[in-house]
Amino acid sequence: MAVYEEFMTHFDGYKIRNVMMFERMINECLHCGEQLLAYRDSQGRIRGYVRFRSRKDHVKVSECIYSGSTVLTKLLKAAVGNHTELRLEVSEAEHLEKVFPLAMSRKRIFTMVRCGNLPLFNKLYNANVRTSKDAYAIGFKPLYLNEKY
């Protein structure tokens, strides 16, 4: 749980997870044909994990939590195995092009937000926003929008 909490400090919000949620995720992986790999440091502490599914022609990563670029690289290398393609969705703020300059990327927008009561929002957050985009802009961390857990 510590590596998850550390990773999430870089984002504007996240879902709080407890041990029971991680146990449920492990059980789901076992029953849905997914794999879960963890990377441990020399002291045996988990420094990252990757949840993925091997397909016929590629590996699809559904979640990757890591404490640094070295850990990320090792996790993805282990996940890709003998496949030639790995698919990973990340926020733009992670800047993976620095770690993987030759990786092909494409932008995909998939979150839509509507602020139902702007006066209430402004009062609660001591803000002066007029649109949902303005509301996102008042946060100084990149968005983390994982709606699965």
PLM regions with names:
Residues 62-149:
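Active-site/acyl-donor-binding loops of N-acyltransferases
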Residues 1-70:
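Amide-forming acyltransferase catalytic core, primarily the GNAT-like/NAT-type
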